């Protein structure tokens, strides 16, 4: 086994591939698409995508407004032309399963995600799984009588719906509901019910060829020290010969490549030898550095 110094040196030489999960001021990001693309270029990437959150049929604080789609796509076309020959630029959408599927049409690629738990007739009352430890504690108590396995079954049942949408090539943050578990353990990932729900969704998604993103967003936000999915889930993905890609779920220029070296090392430790990168038309394998 490599020592700590050897591991650091190894991480330093890991080759950058691309980041397809990044948000801008067109939804809940802090920077313009051009600022994000320039940050990806400075990080050594030869291609990158900016993704806009799909609008939702109820009020919330982070999804894009429907009228933002056209100006976003116009700006992305401008950036594709401006940076041609320097970095390939792609326009993506992070599509929530509660959004209209028609929103998938004009984009180069789509990330399919679940953020909400459907717990009642009022969609605006549906809790978000990644808001805060306090809201997680509240929705578990209020809607699931403290039964975290029931909440996990609800969440993975939602995420499984991504399998039914062929235009969503990537599965976003597979186990997003565990975002806060390093601070306060809300979910028992070793529970038979939790694993059954997670693996049922995983099998459905793998069976239709979805690519699973290994997402470092909670690392940059200070909630986790490792990416989604958890290691046990990554090992299960490897057993199923699933395809994976790495993304930062970045909302600002300083996190576009957060923990990519660490994540590639983790994937190698789980037996992965390649990640899948988008080339503008399809996804192709790239050997992990």
Model-predicted segments: where are they?
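Charged helix-capping and loop-helix junction motifs
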Residues: 189-197, 226-235, 261-262
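Structural recognition of alpha->loop->beta junctions
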Residues: 106-109, 233, 237-244, 261-277
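An N-terminally biased module of ancient metal coordination in phosphate/nucleic-acid-related enzymes
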Residues: 3-97, 178-193, 241, 245, ...
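Hydrophobic residues within beta-strands of alpha/beta enzymes
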Residues: 48-50, 110, 171, 212, ...
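C-terminal regulatory/interaction regions
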Residues: 270-273, 279-289
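His/Asp/Glu-enriched short active-site or ligand-binding loop at hydrolase and phosphoryl-transfer sites
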Residues: 211-222
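Extended substrate/RNA-proximal surfaces in nucleic-acid metabolism proteins
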Residues: 62, 67-207
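Conserved, mostly hydrophobic/aromatic
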Residues: 21, 40, 110, 173, ...
């Amino acid at each position: 086994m490599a020592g700590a110094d050897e591991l650091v040196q190894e991480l330093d030489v890991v080759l950058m591939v691309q980041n397809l999960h990044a948000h801008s001021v067109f939804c809940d990001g802090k920077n313009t698409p051009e600022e994000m693309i320039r940050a990806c270029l400075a990080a050594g990437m030869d291609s990158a995508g900016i993704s806009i959150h799909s609008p939702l049929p109820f009020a919330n604080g982070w999804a894009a407004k429907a009228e933002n789609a056209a100006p976003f796509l116009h700006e992305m076309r401008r950036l594709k032309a401006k940076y041609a020959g320097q970095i390939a630029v792609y326009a993506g959408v992070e599509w929530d399963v509660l959004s209209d599927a028609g929103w998938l049409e004009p984009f180069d690629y789509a990330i399919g995600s679940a953020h909400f738990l459907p717990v009642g007739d009022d969609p605006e009352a549906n809790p978000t799984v990644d808001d805060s430890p306090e809201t997680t504690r509240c929705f578990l108590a209020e809607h699931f009588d403290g039964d975290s396995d029931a909440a996990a079954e609800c969440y993975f049942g939602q995420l499984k719906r991504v399998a039914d949408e062929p235009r969503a090539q990537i599965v976003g943050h597979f186990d997003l509901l565990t975002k806060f578990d390093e601070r306060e353990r809300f979910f028992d990932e070793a529970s038979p019910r939790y694993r059954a729900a997670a693996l049922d969704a995983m099998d459905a998604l793998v069976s239709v060829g979805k690519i699973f993103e290994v997402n470092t967003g909670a690392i940059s936000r200070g909630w986790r020290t490792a990416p989604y999915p958890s290691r046990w889930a990554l090992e299960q993905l490897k057993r199923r010969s699933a395809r994976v890609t790495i993304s930062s779920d970045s909302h600002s220029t300083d996190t576009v490549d957060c923990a990519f070296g660490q994540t590639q090392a983790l994937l190698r430790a789980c037996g992965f030898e390649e990640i899948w990168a988008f080339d503008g038309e399809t996804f192709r394998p790239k050997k992990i550095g």
